[in-house]
Amino acid sequence: MTSEILRNEECNPNLLKKKGLELLDAGKTNEAVECFSKGLVYAPFDSLMRFWRGRKLIGREEYTQSASDLKLAALENPEDWECWYYLGVACYLGGMYEEAKVAHANSKTLMKKYGVNALPATTDWYWMICMKLGQPEEAAKALEDITPDMPTEDGDYLCRVLLYKGVLKPENFVEECEKNCKKQSRC
């Protein structure tokens, strides 16, 4: 449907955004990225198109371009924890550790503010960043508010953080992670 309308309104950024989201739903990531890119020609400050293009560029290992898009999306929408989270991921994977650290600190603050059950995920990335930067004390401090029974959307991140914290041991990590995950109904 959107494709038919776009033939008549090929410069309409809202239709290009809608088409890009439809393409993502259909698993056509490359086509979606191109659609968002075209939409950004007509609406360069559309934070949603920037976010989705930036997020999907991570999967293409285009970390610098991804970080560029996600940074602008985060600045346009500073209360969106996901923009900061994926900016941190892109920066980490692109070797921009200081920027990644700031992004994950912002993500964590916003997750707490809005009650998002994803603290272990951003804490995991933050811990890895601190370790890369040679800041083990700060990495350890980041783990303080993570507990085995905390609600989370992704039990794998929680298990990794509990491993860093010493709650789970490397010798039986997989078994303990599965047990913890089932106990919390997160698998």
Task: Give the positions of each predicted feature.
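Residue-level recognition of tetratricopeptide repeat
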Residues: L21, R55, V89, M128-M131
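Structural marker of alpha-solenoid helical repeat scaffolds
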Residues: N8, Y42, E76, L110-Y114, ...
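Canonical positions in the second alpha-helix
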Residues: I5, K38-G39, L72-A73, N106-S107, ...
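Hydrophobic/aromatic packing residues within the alpha-helices of TPR/SEL1-like helical repeat arrays
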Residues: T2, F36, Y63, L70-K71, ...
